[in-house]
């Protein structure tokens, strides 16, 4: 585990060196680095002059002794310009069709192809084989290609053309770039005099070929937990059910999972976490519509499902409804109920206290605490005589609030269930009950608090998992802040319910 954590620290350090001097390209560098570390491809979409080629050159320095190839495609580009010219000598002397590949795509680790959609069919077909199989057929031999990262770029998306669609599907990570937005970054760009093509990475940080190949074996061992698979499957169902949603091939899903495995590995984890799934927003979009749609779907999944937030919220709501109903039932059972008196000719309903109330001084608790005369009142203390006067004459009830001070008048009525009900100034009401039931109510409240505490512990456990899945180098910080806010909302819900139950 220590070795894995040291690796994570090395990758963080490497990324910081690669990002230096590039403004508002931090996330792009990190995603391209992740793609390079697991042998995937990247498509950069954006206008000219926004450092697309510089990003590709920077990634070369992530690897020790890596070779790079870059080329600007035109409608007239030929395979010779990408894969190397034909050997005249081999053709003349041996009759062999062989290319001289030194310095061209078949012999380089980092490849950048700009204006990729202008490539002709001959280039596209050979390029597809190179991406899929990492092999290049040169005459009568088939050579392995050392390519670790292919970055393609364009200022437009491919047209609806089958010949281009196949290549577009091979570009696993798709990044939509724009010019620098922040004033301070624009100022820093204009003021910088550094040579952007210099190597910013110390040799001891660069990745060796031995390390790269060993890591590929380790990446494949990273586990996809059932909980993360369920989220992925839910996202897949959402996309399938959405009108005009992007078509995502099984191959792309498979390669996306490999990218998530790499993310987990280089963040020092042995299994994919929900945070890694955020990377799917850069893998599954196809056009402007899906580019905007995927972050919305993933935001919902991260704040509701990733750490059981929605289930916990629903369970807390259910507990609140159960408690409310239990309180209502208990209040109806415990509430002081007057006895209805029947008179032969009287039209007005008359009431009296139950016979079992013999005390001259009474303490009556409120089922729902009210603010009366600027005091939060939990119980009232009054003379039995005063209560009888109110029952018979229907005037305001006179009682000491919380048993303190002089008696004060309280608005009160007898409700349809024949129960005395008192009101505050905003007409919020509460029925009353005798102290015999107070001990029972405290015990019941403790039971509800204990049930609530179990939810609190589960929230704490899920929050601990969230913290354990960090830091996550390849995920932007605003995603982490959004997930953190979902835990704050759950905790606030628990606190509010605790106050209600304890009041």
Curated annotation (Swiss-Prot):
What's the chief localization of this chain? cytoplasm
Q: Which domain of life is it from?
A: Bacteria
Would you identify the family this protein belongs to, as annotated? Belongs to the RavA family.
Q: Which InterPro entries is this protein grouped with?
A: AAA+_ATPase, ATPase_RavA, ATPase_RavA_C, MoxR, P-loop_NTPase, RavA-like_AAA_lid, RavA_ATPases, RavA_LARA_dom
What does UniProt give as the signal peptide span? none
Q: Which UniProt keywords apply?
A: ATP-binding, Chaperone, Cytoplasm, Hydrolase, Nucleotide-binding
Location of this chain's protein in the cell: Cytoplasm
The protein's organism comes out as Photorhabdus laumondii subsp. laumondii (strain DSM 15139 / CIP 105565 / TT01) (Photorhabdus luminescens subsp. laumondii)
Name the record gives this protein: Regulatory ATPase RavA
């Amino acid at each position: 585990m220590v070795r894995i954590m040291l690796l994570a620290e090395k990758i963080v350090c490497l990324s910081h060196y690669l990002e230096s001097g590039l403004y508002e390209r931090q996330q792009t560098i990190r995603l391209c680095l992740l793609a390079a570390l697991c042998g995937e491809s990247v498509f950069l979409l954006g206008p000219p002059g926004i450092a697309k080629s510089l990003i590709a050159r920077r990634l070369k320095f992530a690897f020790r002794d890596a070779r790079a190839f870059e080329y600007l495609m035109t409608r007239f580009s030929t395979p010779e310009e990408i894969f190397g010219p034909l050997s005249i000598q081999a053709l003349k002397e041996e009759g062999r069709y062989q290319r001289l590949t030194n310095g061209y795509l078949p012999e380089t680790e980092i490849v950048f192809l700009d204006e990729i959609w202008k490539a002709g069919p001959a280039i596209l077909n050979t390029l597809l084989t190179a991406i899929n199989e990492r092999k290049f057929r040169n005459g009568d031999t088939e050579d392995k290609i050392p390519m670790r990262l292919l970055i393609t770029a364009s200022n437009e998306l491919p047209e609806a053309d089958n010949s281009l669609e196949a290549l577009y599907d091979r570009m696993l990570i798709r990044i939509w770039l724009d010019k620098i937005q922040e004033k301070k970054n624009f100022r820093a760009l204009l003021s910088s005099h550094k040579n952007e093509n210099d190597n910013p990475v110390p040799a001891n940080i660069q990745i060796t070929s031995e390390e790269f190949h060993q890591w590929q074996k380790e990446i494949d061992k990273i586990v996809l937990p059932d909980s993360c698979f369920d989220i992925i499957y839910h996202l897949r169902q959402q996309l399938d059910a959405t009108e005009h949603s992007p078509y995502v091939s099984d191959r792309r899903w498979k390669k996306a999972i490999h990218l998530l495995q790499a993310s987990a590995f280089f963040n020092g984890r042995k299994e994919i976490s929900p945070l890694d799934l955020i990377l799917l927003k850069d893998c599954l979009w196809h056009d402007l519509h899906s580019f905007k749609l995927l972050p919305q779907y993933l935001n919902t999944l991260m704040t509701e499902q990733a750490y059981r937030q929605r289930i916990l919220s629903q369970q807390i709501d259910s507990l609140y409804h159960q408690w409310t109903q239990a309180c209502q039932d208990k209040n109806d059972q415990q509430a002081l109920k007057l006895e209805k008196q029947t008179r032969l000719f009287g039209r007005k309903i008359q009431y009296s206290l139950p016979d079992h109330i013999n005390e001259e001084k009474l303490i009556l608790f409120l089922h729902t605490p009210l603010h009366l005369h600027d005091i939060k009142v939990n119980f009232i203390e009054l003379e039995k005589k005063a209560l009888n006067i109110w029952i018979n004459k229907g005037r305001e009830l006179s009682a000491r609030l919380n048993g303190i001070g002089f008696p004060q008048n309280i608005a009160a009525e007898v409700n349809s269930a024949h129960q005395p009900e008192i009101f505050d100034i905003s007409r919020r009401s509460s029925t009353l009950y005798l102290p015999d039931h107070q001990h029972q109510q405290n015990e019941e409240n403790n039971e509800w608090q204990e049930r609530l505490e179990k939810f609190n512990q589960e929230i704490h456990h899920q929050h601990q998992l969230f913290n354990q899945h960090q830091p996550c180098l390849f995920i932007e910080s605003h995603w982490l802040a959004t997930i953190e806010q979902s835990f704050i909302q759950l905790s606030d819900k628990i606190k509010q319910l605790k106050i209600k139950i304890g009041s």
